[in-house]
């Protein structure tokens, strides 16, 4: 939903935003996800690129997780980051825009602070500049909550896949989100203050690490 909402916003603002869908090979979930994305692009006359993980590399996320010894979510994130950048560089796109929202980014920061690594923390933020071999990355929804993004999809009539990825069960990111939601209920605005505080007081002290 986040990516579709962002694609809709960028296209309405006049950006020549080309969509990228990665077919991850996660059974019927991946099939339905592709169908929804293709329908969105078709209805709005937008250009969509599709990369099938199995066709391009011979394996999907489940197989990659077994081969690498990583949990499925980790293998998925790693493969998506690599492919997104590869396509951007090969197609000549200088900027990659992703739909990560406030809830996503707060959970990532929470996890990174629990297992702090300077290089990882240095890459945390709404903008990463272009580097040799790496397209610039931006996250326009960085300060918008998941609830706000959902409201956007409802107002714009954007149909999206409501079901969670079957591989997400037990993911640490869901635990982090649950913990932050608990804090947010008692302290409204806590997630945004958490992110803004990091960006204003900690991030400037870190060198932007290499990918």
Report residues per predicted region:
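ATP-dependent adenylation/nucleotidyltransferase module used to activate substrates
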Residues: 1-122, 134, 142-155
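ATP/NTP-dependent adenylation/nucleotidyl-transfer catalytic domains that generate, transfer
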Residues: 18, 41, 120-211
């Amino acid at each position: 939903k986040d990516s579709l909402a962002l694609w809709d916003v960028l296209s309405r603002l006049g950006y020549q935003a080309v969509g990228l869908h990665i077919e991850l090979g996660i059974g019927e979930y991946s099939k339905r996800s592709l169908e929804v994305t293709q329908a969105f692009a078709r209805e709005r006359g937008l250009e969509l690129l599709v990369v099938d993980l199995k066709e391009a590399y011979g394996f999907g996320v489940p197989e990659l997780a077994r081969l690498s010894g990583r949990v499925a979510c980790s293998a998925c994130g790693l493969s998506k980051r690599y492919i997104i950048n590869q396509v951007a560089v090969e197609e000549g796109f200088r900027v990659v825009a992703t739909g990560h929202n406030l809830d996503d980014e707060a959970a990532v920061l929470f996890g990174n602070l629990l297992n702090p690594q300077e290089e990882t923390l240095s890459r945390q933020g709404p903008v990463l500049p272009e580097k040799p071999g790496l397209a610039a990355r931006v996250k326009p929804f960085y300060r918008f909550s998941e609830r706000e993004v959902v409201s956007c999809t409802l107002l714009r009539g954007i149909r999206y896949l409501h079901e969670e990825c079957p591989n997400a069960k037990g993911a640490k990111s869901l635990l982090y989100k649950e913990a932050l939601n608990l804090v947010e209920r008692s302290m409204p605005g806590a997630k945004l203050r958490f992110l803004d505080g990091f960006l204003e007081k900690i991030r400037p002290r870190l060198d932007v690490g290499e990918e």
